[in-house]
Amino acid sequence: MAGGAREVLTLQLGHFAGFVGAHWWNQQDAALGRMAEDEESPGELCPDVLYRTGRTLHGQETYTPRLILMDLKGSLNTLKEEGNLYRDRQLEAAVAWQGKLSTHREDAHPKNPNLQGLLSAEGVRSSDGAWRAKLIQNIQNGKENSIKVWSDFLRVHLHPRSICVIHKYHHDGETGRLEAFGQGESVLKEPRYLEELEDRLHFYVEECDYLQGFQLLCDLHDGFSGVGAKTAELLQDEYAGRGVLTWGLLPGPYSLGEPQKNIYRLLNTAFGLVHLTGYSSFVCPLSLGGNLGLRPKPPVNFPSLHYDATLPFHCSAILATALDTVTVPYRLRSSMVTMAHLADVLSFSGKKVVTAEAIIPFPLVRGQSLPDILTQLGEATPWTSLSACGDSAGHRCFAQSVVLRGIDRASHTSKLNPGTPLPSALHACASGEEVLAQYLQQQHPRVLSSSHLLLTPCKVAPPYPHFFSSFSQKGLAMDSTPKGAAVQSIPVFGALRSTSSLHRTLGDLAEELSRLDLRRWASFMDAGVEQDDMEEMLHELHRLAQCYQEGDSLSN
């Protein structure tokens, strides 16, 4: 039992969702280990929201993610489907059969060298009840290219009920791929996989005291968009009234030289968005791409972050960092905000799609205060879009939920001496919360804004990629590259927003799809999609786009 926490069950559907999830759980694990060294945890976030306690066959207490994960055959590499934490090696060694034995050996997957330094007992509390985590080294430059699957860098143990492999499809290879939305829907129409998912849901849900809802990390670009749609439908049918927050994940970049892959991506994304919005509290696309269309725009740019957009290991780390920040409101110990409440704030009047934006890392400089930095950002929209919607500057914001984390209390308000002329109205504020609220009011007057200011930074300890060259261990911006250990934590400014930029994004997607000659892509339709389904999807996509016209607002 979670002891009063408002539990959340996480579902990860797809291989890129596995990449994002691996970084996400590594960050949670690193945050649990903050009591090590000389670091004091502010205790603002409640880990019991995401984790569950358990006990092994030998009585050892465990603390594992409340997680159901679905991926394809060949995606686990050396990770065992049942995990390692609850295995009884004595039982495994016992052989009851007395007859002749024949041995068939299959070459084991070589363990990725990046895993050699990872902790072997993650997810286990020590005898004194404290959490112990071991610092590990950064993955060496050049070796990041060797990371092919998310299990190569996952550093936490999972419960035996977490991993579900869809054996009828292959993760790698030219054939047997889960490529189309219709294929994904069909997976959960098979009793074998549907019953397995239902059993796992019941296992986790029945042990919760107060389940506030589900966070669904789902690949949109391939057949897992169909798996996600059927999963969201199941959650709505079985657990009506609970929040279902869906994060639609899109890797990148895309090549113009792969027409079938691009057309399938476009169709899967559109069908996924439409069906998921029908069964979710809201859907937030997450991508470092510049747009959703067939002609890719350059990946997004972060001024202080150097990443390789061709590496899923890099892209997923950035998206996980944003996700770890924007989900803060329903993971706080002190806040009464639930998933359902957050969705109500953002998704009124049919606006079931929201965007994610972030500054990673927030440019905190030693000696400066929060009013100083926000004033320097000026009136321009400071965030980088993470939803393939392009620059949000000039577009209307209807509602937003904003989180600024990793700012120490001494920097919350102005440090100017009494009598010094104030550079801005922000410098007159008496608290950090007031500074942030005033800044958002200046940025978007008359917009419904929910904001949270946290002391807790975002953990970016290894195996998180080494993105940051001019930052201290605690994420402070510096003029030169510091010597010593890698950056361990960073301040992050993140937002979920309902914005008129979605009118163009969704409308353009519908227009591109309406120009397709579906006769050329009969293989997609043969996977289980009818012409009527296509027409209904286009109609719904246009309807969604209309919800975000400039004239639409909370007041009318």
UniProtKB/Swiss-Prot annotation:
Top-level lineage group: Eukaryota
One family name in Pfam for this protein: Tubulin_3
Keywords: Cytoplasm, Membrane, Mitochondrion, Mitochondrion outer membrane, Phosphoprotein
Record PTM Phosphoserine, positions in chain: S41
The keyword Metal-binding is annotated on this UniProt entry: no
Cellular component GO terms held in the UniProt record: mitochondrial outer membrane
Entries under Gene3D superfamilies matching the protein: Tubulin/FtsZ, GTPase domain (3.40.50.1440)
Any single biological process term in GO: mitochondrion distribution
Family assignment from sequence similarity: Belongs to the misato family.
Functional note: Involved in the regulation of mitochondrial distribution and morphology. Required for mitochondrial fusion and mitochondrial network formation.
Protein name: Protein misato homolog 1
Organism expressing this protein natively: Mus musculus
